[in-house]
Amino acid sequence: AMIIAANGTAQNVQRTSQGIKYAAQGMNVSVEFYSPSIVRVYKTPGETASDKESLVVIKAPEQTPVSFGENGKNVTLSSQMIQVEVNPETGGIYFFDKLGQRLLTDKDYGTQFTPFNDAGVPSYNVRQAFLLDKDEVIYGLGQQQTGKVSQRNQKLFLRNQNMSICIPFIHSIKGYAF
């Protein structure tokens, strides 16, 4: 199925029961509500989705009422707790609370998959960019030996070492986590 944007151009966005799927910037993207307050964004390189079972995401999606709409060239999805706006052209994904306050921006053109050879196994280096509020503090990423509690403006190469443990999970003082 195609969604026709308000400006009359067809976007390659397929609606699912609890979200959308589309291709943008050389990757396949799925945005699915797992509950009224949980949205899963799943990105894979290339134009076809990966059917690999996640070792991390074990929650089955709850039956969640989702409203679909448009905001210019963007597609909107809303539950009773969260609104998500997607730009299928740039790959940008914008998250808002139920009052319309912006929580997080998955930056336009912010995701990159760079192929590399990992000891004979084809793999990817992944770069992901987010825009935070000016004074927003974020915590997480595991046990890092940087002497910093806030991970704001830190550049980290996430890999496990003897005294450094990588856990790719971030929590914001605004109450969301990813």
Language-model segments: what does each one mean?
Residues 2-178:
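N-terminal accessory segment at the very beginning of proteins
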